[in-house]
A protein has these predicted regions:
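Hydrophobic alpha-helical segments, chiefly the membrane-spanning helices
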Residues: 1-331
Length: 331
């Protein structure tokens, strides 16, 4: 048991560090060869930070641990909203851009709805089993390309170009990329094997491990980023990062993962997909129930932006605790 837990923890840490080094090395190489900061942010950084979930998804599906493959994605999406944004908004009101409210959050909701639709062949098309096939993966990637086009368009419009990517020597950058990839591969293997062993030793389902420990572990970068942003009074970036990550998880990770190896769905996971949909709806409602106002002159106040307030954050955390309680009850 101790060995399995150590494998799981070590695997998650290696995934996080491997993704960090992969992004650092790849960004440096891209910068050195004249790639713009905008394109680095859209491609290298965005894809690199999604590598932990991608590696866990691929390894678990190849090893036949389908519940971990899907549970990691669904559980990560739930944790990103209810846990990560819940904690961040309790620390400080989290501002939300109008484009995020009306475009990205609905797109995140669409992603989960599409996932549930495609993962229920046995109910919709009366197939013997429900499976995410390679054709489903191609459809996910088609949605993902539309999302990338939207992000590129919005960033150019808002002039949100990230600066500060460090340019290192080519050998050093290649070293970072190589070591990062190695850590990701090893971390993915250790995480999945540790999760499978823990589930077997404790007599609990692999879905439970995937939806909780593995999902929270792979969501740690989003949690740390969002909490630090809230502490540094830059909480407005938290929602965009979380919502973008949720869209990436479904359209990019499930797309690539199912093309490499189709994934079967346990019907019990439909309840978790429903919770992921509910969490996204709760987020959409939360950003409309709180507003920050700015006083102009003496009496007139103008609405400044949508926010997720502390009360909303508490509600989100309570919902997440209730969900964990449900998972324990379900086993």
């Amino acid at each position: 048991m101790i060995l399995a837990l150590a494998m799981l923890i070590a695997g998650i840490l290696l995934l996080i560090k491997g993704a960090d080094w992969l992004v650092e090395g790849s960004s440096s190489l891209a910068k050195r060869f004249g790639v713009s900061d905008l394109m680095i942010g859209l491609t290298v950084v965005a894809f690199g930070t999604s590598m932990p979930e991608l590696l866990v998804n691929i390894v678990s599906s190849v090893e036949g641990a389908n519940d971990i493959a899907i549970g990691n994605i669904v559980g990560s999406n739930i944790a990103n909203i209810l846990l990560v944004l819940g904690i961040a908004s309790i620390i400080r009101n989290v501002a939300v851009k109008t484009s995020t409210v009306w475009n990205e959050i609905p797109l995140a909701l669409l992603a989960v709805l599409v996932l549930q639709l495609m993962a229920n062949d046995s109910i919709i098309d009366h197939y013997p089993v429900s499976e995410l096939s390679r054709s489903d993966g191609l459809a996910f990637l088609a949605f993902f390309l539309i999302f990338l086009w939207y992000v590129a368009k919005m960033r150019r419009r808002e002039d949100e170009i990230e600066n500060g990517f460090v340019e290192r020597g080519v050998p050093v950058s290649i070293g970072f990329v190589s070591i990062g990839l190695g850590l990701l591969l090893l971390g993915g293997k250790l995480t999945v094997d540790g999760a499978i062993d823990i589930a077997s030793l404790l007599g609990i389902s692999q879905a439970f491990i995937g939806l909780t420990i593995v999902a929270i572990g792979t969501s740690l970068p989003e949690l740390v980023t969002s909490v630090l942003a809230a502490v540094r009074k830059k909480a407005d970036i938290a929602v965009g990062n979380v919502v973008g990550s949720n869209i990436f998880n479904v359209f990019w990770i499930m797309g690539v993962g199912t093309i490499i190896h189709p994934v079967r769905l346990d019907p019990a996971l439909n309840a978790d997909l429903f919770v992921a949909i509910l969490a996204t709806v709760v987020l959409f409602i939360a950003v409309h129930t709180g507003h920050v106002h700015r006083r102009i002159f003496l009496f007139w106040r103008q609405r400044q932006e949508h926010v997720i307030g502390r009360t909303d954050g508490v509600i989100m955390l309570l919902l997440y605790v209730a969900y964990l309680g449900y998972l324990v009850w379900r086993g």
